[in-house]
Amino acid sequence: MEEIQRYLHLERSEQQDFLYPLIFQEYIYTFAHDRGFSRSIWSENRGYENKSSLLIVKRLINRMDQENHFLISPNDSNQNPFWACNKNFYSQILSEGFAFSVEIPFSRRLISCLEKKIVKFQNLRSIHSTFPFLEDNFSHLNFVLDILIPHPVHVEILVQTLRYWVKDASSLHFLRFFLNEYCNWNSVITPTKASSSFSKRNQRLFLFLYNSHVCEYESIFVFLRNQSSYLRSTSSGVLLERIYFYGKIKRLVNVFVKLKDFQANLWLVKEPYLHSIRYQRKSILASKGTSLFMNKWKCYLVTFWQSHFSLWFHPRRISINQLSNYSLDFLGYHSSVRMNPSVVRSQILENAFRINNAIKKFDTLVPIIPLVASLAKAKFCNVLGHPISKPVWADLSDSNILDRFGRICRNLSHYHSGSSKKKSLYRIKYILRLSCARTLARKHKSTVRTFLKRLGSVFLEEFLMSEENVLFLTFPKASSTFRRVYRSRIWYLDILSINDLANYKYKL
């Protein structure tokens, strides 16, 4: 336990960040509003315009400076109708400003990484950098732990977690008071309607709180994973002899320390290494070990959540699957490890043999049905996948309509460039192109056939050109080579966020 504390002590920031005075500064709320940290929270309260936002902040700060705190009880709000109407709005402004302030210590860590000029740091920030890692490692593994990160989390646990990172007691007391007195919940993420609506209005703050909770979990888990060779199972009587075996190994190290091949043979007594991936509210642990080894880690994680976070973590939230029968849906891809059969013909003198080999291959596919459902929700097609016009864009200019449809089509092609089967994207491109044609035909009050006959299909292809065509036009002499390259999987490491249309399933 002391070793874990030393590890966390080195990992966390030791700077004294006094953030509480920033909450009373007007420019903090201006930054939170202008830099896009809030999604037009001012427009939700129609009684105020953007030009009056500074006046609202001054009013809020004056209430905070008063002896009677502005976070009053519901009984007081009944006596003051004006405050009852604007209570949610003031809390929303305050949460955005507080979220902006409390992110400052974490932003310093990012700046320090940039100043150190870490090699390929920008590439590591890409969400697509996960897939090359999966291609290199998952095909050689046997079992996988599928973990659903537990929630809800008590407010006090979140405040205690932030205490290790933010060395400002006043800010933490203010956050505790804000969460307990205003919303009066026992948890940040709860199924009640009141808490869910509150978290939607204050999305930036609660995303930060949830991510800090997950960061605490990952910090300790990384330490446990790196020290996994010292986590020995002693519960089974069959394995008790291993304790004496490790003691013998320690004595043998002093004797054979000069032998070169001794260190190479130590892997026989070490636990298999764990590969971990987290995406949103799920976490995956994969290993080449046995089912007994994975069950041991399952017990470790259940005990860890219950002891460190005081959370009842049901073992059913962790499932053990064999990797050959496991599929993974995340970041807009359906990934799995499948067997790729191959036949090798071998001939020795007059005898010929055929050897059937099955090679594991990490496969990534685009789930068409959920993607079509996302297009239907965005009003590009109906639920059956038939393209329809976009009436909201019918008042725009022709070039603007074509530019919007073309940008969506190119972004989807760019995002799903790592798909093993590119032909599945043709249906998506077809829906977008025909939806664009119907939108233009609706604007000009004509049919799609008449519109395309008058302007020609080349007019649409000019704006809805896929990455494949752009690649061939850029390098016309090597079109056959680039065609083979395009058909293979390409992971672009400049993608920092999931595509909106591909984010169809996992939403926090």
Swiss-Prot record:
Q: Which GO terms describe its cellular component?
A: chloroplast
Q: Name one GO biological process term.
A: mRNA processing
Q: Which residues form the signal peptide?
A: none
Q: Where in the cell is it found?
A: Plastid, Chloroplast
Q: Report the protein's function.
A: Usually encoded in the trnK tRNA gene intron. Probably assists in splicing its own and other chloroplast group II introns.
> To which protein family does this belong?
Belongs to the intron maturase 2 family. MatK subfamily.
- Protein name in UniProt: Maturase K
Q: Which organism is it from?
A: Verbena rigida (Tuberous vervain)
Q: Which gene encodes it?
A: matK
